[in-house]
């Protein structure tokens, strides 16, 4: 039972003065019925409020620092700007309680029901929230530094502008969560599920997002400076105008993600999946795409000079008219890719695979194709002055009207290549002529074989028609 004197005094304006004069007294309000009372600004520090009923009470600005609040009732209560620092609120039902601007630093709210509660602008730094249900809660503008979110339910929870610095959200599910303008600096979001989440303008400086899911998430204008997204899944995510300074995206799944006007320096996309990604307007400096899968990616007219594509795959990719002077494409797979009219001066394509690659009209001055396989590639009208094709395979390639002045062709394979009106390097004119002759002979032989087969099929059809007209030939007796 509550101390009658304490309970009676609490309802008067003299309460706070009494607390000052009796600082060593611990108010005993055990089981007190405070329902509907106006406790605005009351000094309740270190008070024993076990089993007290705060239903519909107004505790705006009240100070409950280190108060005992076990088994209390809060239905319909309002505690805007109240102080709950170092309080134990574990297992309480705080559904729809108004805590806007309240302070909960170092408080414990473990396994609480916080459904629909309003913590807008509240300070929950270092608060323990493990196992609580925050479904539908409002944490817009709240401070949640160093909070552990393990086991928390966050369905339809709003974190607009919340400060989640150094928060631990590893393995948390926040599918379609609302985090616009949130600050995740130094937070741990490893394996966190943020599929379809609103992360516009969010700050992920130094954030751990390894193996996290951001698929279909809206990350427009988000900042990922020094963030770790290795093995993260961000399929069809929106990274429009996002920043990626020193971001690690190694082995991340970025298929069909949008990078419109995105940028950053020292970005690592090594071994990442960038299938069908549009990077035309992206502006990355010193980006590393080593071993990345860029099949069917769109980079038309992009400036690739600061990039490295060692071992990358460009199968079916569009790189027409790109600026890639001096870029390293060694061991890359450019099969079926288009580099039409591209600037590839002094680019390194050594050891690359380029079956049916389109390099027509491209600028290949001083480019290195040593050991490259360019079978059936299109190099028409290419300017390959001084290019190195040592040990390269150009079988079936079309070299028509190209300029190979001073190019190197040591141990190069030309079988079936077409070199009509091509300008060969000194001493290689005969080789080009023979290549063209063999190509024409092969075409003629193939054409003759096709014509012969066509005649055979026609004769079979005629015989089949004649057989159909004749009466069936019967043998034997009935």
Can you name each region flagged by the protein language model?
Residues 5-10, 14-456, 464, 474, ...:
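Tandem repeat scaffolds
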């Amino acid at each position: 039972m509550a101390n009658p004197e304490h309970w009676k005094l609490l309802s008067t304006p003299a309460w706070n003065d009494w607390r000052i004069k009796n600082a060593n007294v611990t108010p005993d309000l055990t089981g007190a019925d405070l329902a509907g009372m106006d406790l605005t600004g009351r000094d309740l520090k270190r008070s024993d409020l076990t089993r007290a009923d705060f239903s519909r009470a107004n505790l705006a600005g009240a100070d409950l620092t280190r108060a005992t609040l076990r088994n209390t009732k809060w239905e319909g209560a309002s505690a805007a700007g109240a102080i709950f620092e170092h309080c134990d609120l574990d297992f309480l039902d705080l559904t729809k309680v108004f805590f806007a601007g309240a302070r909960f630093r170092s408080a414990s709210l473990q396994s609480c029901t916080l459904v629909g509660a309003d913590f807008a602008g509240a300070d929950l730094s270092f608060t323990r929230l493990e196992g609580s249900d925050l479904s539908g809660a409002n944490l817009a503008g709240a401070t949640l530094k160093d909070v552990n979110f393990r086991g928390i339910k966050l369905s339809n929870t709003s974190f607009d502008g919340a400060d989640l610095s150094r928060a631990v959200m590893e393995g948390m599910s926040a599918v379609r969560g609302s985090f616009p303008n949130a600050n995740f600096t130094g937070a741990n979001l490893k394996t966190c599920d943020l599929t379809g989440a609103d992360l516009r303008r969010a700050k992920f400086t130094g954030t751990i997002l390894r193996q996290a899911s951001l698929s279909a998430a809206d990350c427009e204008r988000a900042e990922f400076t020094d963030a770790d997204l290795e093995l993260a899944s961000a399929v069809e995510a929106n990274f429009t105008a996002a920043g990626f300074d020193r971001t690690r995206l190694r082995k991340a799944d970025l298929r069909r993600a949008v990078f419109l006007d995105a940028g950053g320096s020292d970005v690592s996309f090594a071994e990442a999946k960038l299938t069908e990604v549009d990077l035309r307007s992206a502006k990355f400096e010193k980006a590393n795409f080593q071993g990345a899968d860029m099949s069917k990616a769109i980079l038309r007219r992009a400036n690739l000079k600061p990039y490295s594509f060692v071992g990358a795959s460009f199968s079916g990719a569009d790189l027409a008219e790109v600026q890639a002077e001096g870029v390293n494409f060694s061991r890359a797979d450019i099969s079926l890719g288009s580099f039409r009219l591209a600037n590839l001066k002094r680019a390194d394509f050594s050891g690359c695979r380029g079956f049916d690659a389109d390099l027509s009209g491209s600028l290949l001055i001083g480019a290195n194709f040593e050991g490259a396989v360019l079978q059936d590639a299109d190099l028409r009208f290419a300017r390959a002055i001084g290019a190195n094709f040592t040990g390269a395979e150009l079988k079936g390639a079309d070299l028509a009207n190209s300029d190979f002045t001073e190019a190197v062709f040591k141990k190069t394979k030309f079988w079936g290549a077409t070199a009509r009106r091509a300008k060969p390097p000194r001493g290689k004119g005969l080789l080009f002529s023979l290549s063209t002759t063999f190509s024409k002979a092969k075409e003629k032989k193939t054409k003759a074989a096709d014509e012969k087969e066509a005649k055979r099929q026609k004769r079979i059809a005629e015989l089949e028609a004649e057989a159909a007209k004749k009466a069936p030939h019967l043998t034997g007796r009935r």
